[in-house]
From Swiss-Prot:
Disruption phenotype: Affects GAS1 and GGP1 O-mannosylation. This is Dolichyl-phosphate-mannose--protein mannosyltransferase 6. Keywords: Acetylation, Endoplasmic reticulum, Glycoprotein, Glycosyltransferase, Membrane, Repeat, Transferase, Transmembrane, Transmembrane helix. It catalyses: a di-trans,poly-cis-dolichyl beta-D-mannosyl phosphate + L-seryl-[protein] = 3-O-(alpha-D-mannosyl)-L-seryl-[protein] + a di-trans,poly-cis-dolichyl phosphate + H(+); a di-trans,poly-cis-dolichyl beta-D-mannosyl phosphate + L-threonyl-[protein] = 3-O-(alpha-D-mannosyl)-L-threonyl-[protein] + a di-trans,poly-cis-dolichyl phosphate + H(+). The gene is PMT6.
Length: 759
């Protein structure tokens, strides 16, 4: 009994010796071995649990970061491609940008207020569509059957659709709550103004896309701020520069987001400067890398776009008048006529300024309303009979041309230092200046048309000063007399004999009484390099001299063409001012955009046509505008608590507030306030980039407000916001997907009396 009890097996038959011997002789288990076996078992269970959790997390991450944004992107493509060819007429600014694209197909030079990248991309879409350039994109005209306008529009819509994933990852990198990230991406996807602008051959979707990518790249650099100088950081720095170059090459509005990136860069460099552990040589390296990537590369992209622009447009076209003579005469089919190579007394000619405003010297019968009251002298770019002048002998010389345009049968060339008088062919008045202030610029003298062939004084006299001669590639004309005035290749100045000032173009324009033409003055100029006082003869006629048909003009300088083209763009842009005497139903004021006070009819409102109304989503616009009002108070609240030392903010928290709230707010201001302050005419679509940044501000306000709210309150709020965004899109979908038939059917969408959707 005692033995059986000792073994602890009382229930087993002890008469079986073999069995008893087997158990009696078996060694006892070690306690540490049992513990190790138990630990191994627990570790295996934990590993299985950890693997399962990792698999679940990976699946969730793929669903959240890949499948989710992919579905939103597909939705974005669908909404922008949907019914894209339903309106087969030229809609709104397709009349401009479709036509500009066709000029690249035909290689005809044109002028526009915007840089060329966006229009070259439109030309690419036209080339892909097999367009031959013959359709002129006249407003409201139907597209011919042989013009694949659907593909052109789809190409443009692609930029708009890709804004959705850019918005998603930007919001994610900014550190927003994932519900907020998805809400912002959904708002961008369902924004009515973004959808409708993407459906047509316009620049706005490209501008929005590159503005968003520039901001996204900046945010990505923020996430990599502790990994500076790594390959990944360097790649995103390069992408930022490429994006800046693209957005500025589509529209100058891209400069606004460039300012934001510049501000962020300055903050980074300042913080690096304050880092006493950073060697100075590394600090200067940071400067160098940013200068190369954020200044040099964008500028080279901008420059290269113009290089391609000039190479493609090698034929004479509608934009010739905005360029200098050398550029024009090198165009195929130029309108500048071949003429004699020596300019002489009796020659009739046109004279073009070599300044930043390369206009032709012009006069007409109208007089100055103030000042001398004599005939106006202006600069005018287009071919016109009022641009023609004639070289006469000066008043003080007492000489006159005979009936054959010679001096007693002799042809007297115009040489350096000779005194001349310029008479206007149509009015007969003389180019004149006197001690009367100019009308637009300050500190200059008025230039007027005065007298006639027989009436005048010494203030009609000017002295020719030759400043530069350019040689022809043709050896026959490569050694022309450098003291004689030659058309096209000679640059000269006209110094007033009495006042000592120089005939100049200021780059400014006269008011309506001067037909918005360029101001011409007589200015004191102490430098021969002052290009505003440089002129050249463009067209030249003299029946006493032989025409040089085989003359080959010098090539124009790329840098000169680049600078003059950009200045012409700026001048044209500044000229887009509202006409106070004319009501423009399409234009709107900046205050009307965030309030959604007014929209824009994009096409004819006839009942038989598919109609589109450019207006922001009421949900997106109004909720983001409210956020813009709330945001400054949130910042003041944070500063107040920080100042009272009731709130501690770490460096990372300060950065988070800056990136999520302050930079989107600054971006909104830089994209909105310039339009509110500028004098040019403005339209609803000018708010497109600013609206995106207003949505990001809304994301910050939402995240800040709901940070400590219980999930039972937070989730219903998010659900209602998603529901509201989707519901408002569906309600107002006709304004961006097309309205058909009876206009009265859309009266329920007429929420405000200022909206003209239904009438």
């Amino acid at each position: 009994m005692s033995k059986a009890k000792g073994t602890g097996f009382s229930s087993i038959d002890t008469e079986d010796e073999n069995l008893r011997e087997r158990y009696v002789n078996q060694p006892k288990a070690n306690a540490s071995d049992i513990q190790d076996e138990q630990l191994d078992c627990f570790e295996q269970l934990e590993e299985k649990h950890r693997t399962k959790k990792n698999e679940e997390y990976t699946a969730l991450k793929i669903l959240r970061d890949v499948i989710g944004p992919l579905l939103l992107t597909i939705t974005s493509f669908y909404l922008r491609f949907q019914h894209i060819d339903q309106n087969n007429y030229v809609v709104w600014d397709e009349a401009h940008f479709g036509k500009f694209g066709s000029y690249y197909i035909k290689h005809e030079y044109y002028h526009d207020v915007h840089p060329p990248l966006g229009k070259m991309l439109i030309a690419l879409s036209e080339w892909m569509a097999g367009f031959d350039g013959q359709f002129d994109f006249s407003s409201n005209n139907a597209y011919p059957e042989n013009v694949n306008f659907k593909l052109m529009r789809q190409f443009n819509a692609t930029f708009g659709a890709l804004c959705t994933p850019v918005a998603f990852f930007t919001a994610k990198w900014m550190g927003f709550n994932y519900f907020t990230v998805y809400l912002i991406a959904t708002m961008v996807t369902l924004e009515h103004s973004y959808i409708v602008l993407s459906k047509f051959i316009l620049l706005d979707s490209m501008l929005l896309f590159f503005s968003m990518t520039t901001f996204a790249c900046m945010i990505k650099l923020y996430t990599l701020r502790k990994q500076q100088m790594t390959k990944k950081w360097s790649l995103w720095m390069l992408l930022t520069g490429l994006s800046i170059g693209c957005v500025c090459s589509v529209k100058w509005v891209g400069l606004f987001i460039t300012v934001v990136v510049g501000l962020y860069t300055c903050i980074e460099l300042f913080l690096l400067y304050c880092d006493k552990e950073l060697p100075r040589i590394k600090y200067y390296k940071h400067w160098l890398i940013r200068i190369i990537n954020l200044i040099v590369i964008p500028f080279l992209i901008y420059l290269y776009c113009f290089k391609i622009h000039f190479v493609l447009l090698y034929k004479s076209g509608t934009g010739d008048s905005t360029t200098n003579t050398l550029f024009q005469i090198n165009l195929e089919g130029t309108q500048i006529e071949a003429g004699p190579r020596d300019v002489a007394f009796g020659s009739e000619l046109t004279i073009r300024s070599h300044g930043l405003s390369p206009n032709l010297l012009h006069s007409h019968i109208q007089v100055y309303p103030e000042g001398s009251g004599q005939r106006q002298i202006t600069g005018y770019g287009f071919a016109d009979s009022n641009n023609v002048w004639k070289f006469e002998f000066s008043r003080s010389s007492g000489l006159e041309l005979d009936q054959n345009g010679t001096l007693n049968g002799k042809i007297i060339p115009i040489t350096d230092g000779v005194e001349v008088r310029l008479s206007h062919k149509n009015t007969g008045s003389n180019l004149h200046s006197h001690d009367v202030p100019s009308h637009v610029s300050r500190g200059n003298y008025e230039v007027s048309g005065y007298g006639s062939q027989s009436v005048g004084d010494e203030k009609d006299d000017w002295i020719v000063e030759i400043v530069k001669q350019m040689d022809s590639p043709n050896p026959v004309y490569s050694n022309e007399n450098s003291t004689i005035l030659h058309p096209v290749s000679t640059f000269f100045r006209l110094r007033h004999k009495v006042l000592g000032c120089y005939l100049a173009s200021t780059g400014l324009t006269y008011p309506a009484w001067g037909f918005k033409q360029a101001e011409i003055v007589c200015k004191d100029s102490w430098s021969r390099r002052d290009k505003s006082t440089w002129w050249n003869v463009e067209d030249h006629w003299n029946h006493n001299l032989e025409t040089a048909e085989d003359y080959v003009p010098p090539k124009s300088n790329f840098w000169t063409d680049f600078i003059l083209t950009n200045f012409a763009m700026a001048s044209s842009n500044n000229a887009l001012v509202p006409d106070e005497d004319k009501y423009d139903s399409l234009s709107s004021d900046a205050w009307e955009w965030p309030t959604l006070h007014k929209g824009l009819r994009m096409c004819s409102w006839a009942g038989y046509i598919t109609r589109y109304y450019l207006m922001g989503s009421p949900f997106n616009t109004w909720i983001s505008t409210v956020s813009l009002i709330i945001f400054p108070f949130i910042i003041l609240f944070i500063l107040y608590r920080w100042r009272r030392q009731t709130l501690y903010l770490s460096d990372d928290q300060i950065w988070q507030i800056t990136i999520q709230g302050i930079f989107p707010f600054i971006s909104w201001m830089t994209h909105y306030l310039p339009f509110a302050m500028m004098g040019r005419v403005t339209y609803v679509h000018h708010y497109v980039p600013a609206l995106y940044f207003a949505m990001l501000v809304f994301g910050f306000v939402l995240d800040f407000t709901l940070t400590r709210v219980h999930w039972m309150v937070k989730y219903p709020i998010y659900l209602s916001l998603f529901g509201g965004c989707i519901y408002i899109y569906n309600l107002f979908a006709p304004i961006c997907q097309g309205m058909h038939g009876d206009k009265a059917e859309y009266l329920p969408l007429q929420w405000l009396s200022t909206w003209d959707i239904a009438p």
